[in-house]
Curated annotation (Swiss-Prot):
Molecular function GO labels: serine-type endopeptidase inhibitor activity
Function per UniProt: Putative acid-stable proteinase inhibitor.
Entry keywords, A to Z: Disulfide bond, Protease inhibitor, Secreted, Serine protease inhibitor, Signal
UniProt subcellular location: Secreted
Name of the featured protein: WAP four-disulfide core domain protein 13
Annotated S-S bridges: 38-62, 45-66, 49-61, 55-70
GO cellular component, as recorded: extracellular region
Signal peptide segment: 1-22
Length: 81
């Protein structure tokens, strides 16, 4: 029996199926269905939402540390020093 060359071994290992976490379908559904992250921390986490239509006019539905809430979602103002 001939010894196996390192190149043959590398070829076999590269062709072996690699484990994959989740599926692309789950990733895209999560991206489409979940609102974007909030740009600033919400003042109060008492107005929850699942869609933009559930929030009053000036507020936006976004994902924060306390859940998916309606907030002003304004970008934080950086002070110049």
């Amino acid at each position: 029996m001939r010894p196996v060359s390192p190149l043959q071994l590398l070829l076999v290992l590269s062709l072996a199926p690699q484990p994959v976490l989740g599926s692309p379908k789950q990733y895209f559904l999560k991206y489409i269905l979940e609102p974007p992250p909030c740009r600033s921390e919400p003042g109060a986490c008492n107005m929850f939402c699942t869609q933009q239509e559930e929030c009053p006019e000036p507020l936006q539905c976004c994902s924060a540390y306390c859940g998916i809430v309606c907030t002003s979602n304004q970008a934080p103002v950086l002070g110049l020093s």
